[in-house]
Amino acid sequence: MKRVLAALLLLCAVTMSAGVAAQTQMNVYFAANAMDEETAGALMERTRQAFPQAQWRAIGPTGERDLRALILGDDMPDLIVCAPSEASLWVSDGLFIALDGCLTDASRISEPVLDACVQDETLFMLPLTAKHRQMAVNRRLLEKRRMGYMANAIEHPIWYPMEFDQLLEEFALADHPALEIWPAEPETCGALEALLQALYGGAWLTEGGETGQADHINVQAALEWLRDRVRGGLIARVGSREEALAHFLNGETALFMDWQTGDERRCARELEKNGIELLTMPYPSSTGFVIRSFELTGVCVAAGANSALAMRAAAFWHEDAQAQRALGERGIWKDDAVWLPEIDATQKGLTLRRLMCEAIESALSGESTPKDALRLVQTTLDAM
């Protein structure tokens, strides 16, 4: 009897061991700044529930272990969550599976978003989320200066530069600038980039996001506009984004130029405590259209033994209702706005951002004209 029992226990142990060994290990790479930790965690948990036959492990860049290092080290993840430009470097090498058949709602998605996910007429990435920046407005401060009519979204869905000037001048007369900007630095210059793109519709990048066009005449006009308002005292300068945000939340300024998805939740206590009636506005633009500077995050499927399961998971993220709730306001859907790609956080993007920041600071300080500063950026980009 003991021998039979021992044999049964051994059989059970072997069976359990085989079951564990049979589970596929699936690695999901999240690039830096691709997705906040809470969202990534919720997405992974939902994936584990939907695909229990695999062990799902989230990995991120640590030290030098970014996507490039993983690929060159023959340690390719199964799913890659990153900006299109980070993944596009490897598309021609055949490292990713074509995902054309996985996208069932392409007609609803903004064309520039889809264009960013296509290379050589192949969809190499499924779009997940797009981050958009906008301005936060203190409605009560506008009403106090008899400019509450500009907070009417029906009559003023967007402000033209001339209207924006009137607002800035009204607050400057009261010695309380409506808007503050901070030093242009690669980590915090996204709002300046978005403002300069929106003012006259000049894009830092071509529509697909692959090529820099920093010396675009409309970018130059926008930088001249910003320089003149700073020199004239209509726009104030502070030391950091955090300082400008604190002034807005304290009710000291009417506008904050870098309001992002999630800021209302993060700042809810201060907004309520200080009685700020918040509304959001797109950046002012002479085009008459809302200009959306967007930063896209998507998912790629690596070619390999696990690609079938990885492809199912990627499609699941794009369609499952609970996955949609985890992703939140995805920001990829088609509307009447003009969409312009924001400079991404890849090495190439960071180079452009550093050059852009140097050009902005040079122009604002009077060290060079906007035209000369931007021409230097473009010359450097062309030489790369």
Question: Where does each model-flagged region fall?
Answer:
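Helix-loop-helix "hinge/cap" segment bordering the ligand-binding cleft or interdomain interface
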Residues: 118-188, 202-236, 369
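Conserved N-terminal structural module of periplasmic/extracytoplasmic solute-binding proteins
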Residues: 2-9, 13-87, 287, 325-326, ...
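Extracytoplasmic/periplasmic substrate-recognition and gating elements
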Residues: 52, 269-331, 358, 365, ...
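Conserved C-terminal helix/tail region of periplasmic/extracytoplasmic solute-binding proteins
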Residues: 334-384
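Short amphipathic alpha-helical coupling segments at ligand-binding clamshell hinges
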Residues: 39, 43, 221-222, 304-317, ...
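Hinge/lid segment of periplasmic solute-binding proteins
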Residues: 82-134, 162, 277-281
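Extracytoplasmic "Venus flytrap"/periplasmic binding protein-like
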Residues: 50-109, 145-146, 150, 246-247, ...
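Extracytoplasmic/periplasmic substrate-binding proteins
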Residues: 87, 191-195, 199, 220-306
